[in-house]
Amino acid sequence: MDRTLIPFCSFGLSVDVLKQRWSRWYVALVLICAMVTCPPEVDAVCVAEALATGIEAGLVIHLSPGCTPAEREAHAVRGEAVMDAIAKGRPVDLLGVIVRGDLIFDHLAVQSMSRAPVPAPERTNQEDRAGGSGQRVVRKALSLRESVVLGAVRHRSADDTLRFEGPVDFSRSHFKDGVDLSRSVFHESVELSGATFEKEAYFVQGQFAQPVGCRETKFGPSTRFHRSVFRGSVNCTAALFDGMAEFLEVSFEQPTTFERSRFGLGTGFSGSRFKNRVSFSEAIFSRETFFAFTAFESEAEFAGAQFLGSADFSQAEFRQQDDLAQARFDQPPLLAQTKRFEPAQPSGLLQTRNWQYGLTLMLLAVAALLVAYAVRLK
């Protein structure tokens, strides 16, 4: 009887061993899945691209959208580090980063105008506007995307210009303090779309050689582009100008759009020149708006625009037929000495109304004579 029990005992032991082995494999599989789905290193998920190294390398930090506020604080960049990279002629590419401290471009070394090749017409225009002989140069691309800049961004020199030789991209960034890049020359495209300027945004006497994007940009209490020149297209569709918006004596050389934009306080385009198509369709002007002495050399679209305050078009000039009649004015617009395009009337004697009446009478008389002559023949 003992001999018959031995095989059954051996079979029972084999089953127990198999169960233990399967349990160990199951535990190992669970651990592997946990390691894959929940990696222990948080920084590897947060930092998509870390600080570049090398003599010619730029300042590059990309943080993914999943980074927590604490992780962004841990990877914050000092404003001095940004300006140091710019001073050394290196590109700056920050994505989703917090920048602490000011970005003062007045600290860059001043160079002579003759050191940088500038086309003669642009150089003449620049010297006329700037009045100085020095310049500060940002040689590489400057990109602050989806970032938060806690300090001020300044260039306040009254004598020198600031030249950006590479593209500038501030898209979807948040500027907590004021931005003043007046007297700047931008050789490449400028992208401000989706950015928020909590305080002033000044680009006085700016020169923009390439397209400027400001779609859905939120400007703060004061925005100034006084005496600026836009040689490329401008797209400010659905932009919000929460405070004063000054575009006085500005030259727009390519198609420009402010469609569905909102202007919260006083708005001025007086003395400006639109050399190409411009559209203010469905824009809302909440307060006083000035287009006095403004020249519209091509199409000017105002269909669906709302002027909730006074609108001054005095001595403005429309060289093509305007559609102001399709805009809404809560107060009658001021059109004193405004030059509006009128379609040319058809020329020729036969096109005038008096001659048409005379021709009709003459034909009737001839017809009557023919009838009388026919009656006599009978």
Regions picked out by a protein language model, each given a short descriptive name:
Residues 26-37:
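Bacterial N-terminal signal peptides
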